[in-house]
Amino acid sequence: MLSASEGEQTVRLARNTIESFLKDGEQSDSIDLPEVFGELRGVFVTLTKNGNLRGCIGHPYADSVLESAIVDSAISAATRDPRFPMVDISEMSDIIVEVTVLTQPELVDVLPDKLPEVIEIGRHGLIAKMGMYQGLLLPQVAPENDFDAIDLLNHTCLKAGLPQDAWLTGAQMYWFEGQIFKEVEPRGDIEENKFNSCCK
């Protein structure tokens, strides 16, 4: 688990990276960060503006060190999310930055009809995989949208471009947990959002 101070630094790194890139087209200079930023971690950066999603991209798997994963995800969330136009620097005073540091996804090894019984809302995020299709929902999505376990399974499959009941018909479901750090207001204090117990 990251400490509160380390979590705060994840969000500041994400914001500083975005603002530097939008101003100059360059990444901000590397700064001295705690040891955990050199560990392999999955991470997502989420941007919201006036309560609405403005960008969300990340690394589901621990394929990069945390610092690099945050930098890449932050720039991508602001400039490469295909659902939204590129963020303009003038918007950053209205955007809340959130960073979710992930545990390594693991296959949920139960019979499909038992999946709703083992998934814990607020604790588990999900990845649905079938063939070339893959989709992910972060742990905070379910409590933020009042989903139960079946809703979460259905929406994860839809995110993957699959039928919503694909979790019953052959899709592999992976779960993971996330430690969530978020600005209370744009450029404001940073708090850890705890929907449930986390993490391994």
From Swiss-Prot:
InterPro entries: AMMECR1 (IPR023473), AMMECR1_dom_sf (IPR036071), AMMECR1_domain (IPR002733), AMMECR1_N (IPR027485), AmmeMemoSam_A (IPR027623), Uncharacterised_MJ0810 (IPR023472)
Residues in AMMECR1 domain copies: 5-192
Domain of life: Archaea
One Pfam family matching this protein: AMMECR1
UniProt xrefs under HAMAP family: AMMECR1
Record protein name field: Protein Mbur_1344
Native species: Methanococcoides burtonii (strain DSM 6242 / NBRC 107633 / OCM 468 / ACE-M)
Upper lineage: Archaea, Methanobacteriati, Methanobacteriota, Stenosarchaea group, Methanomicrobia
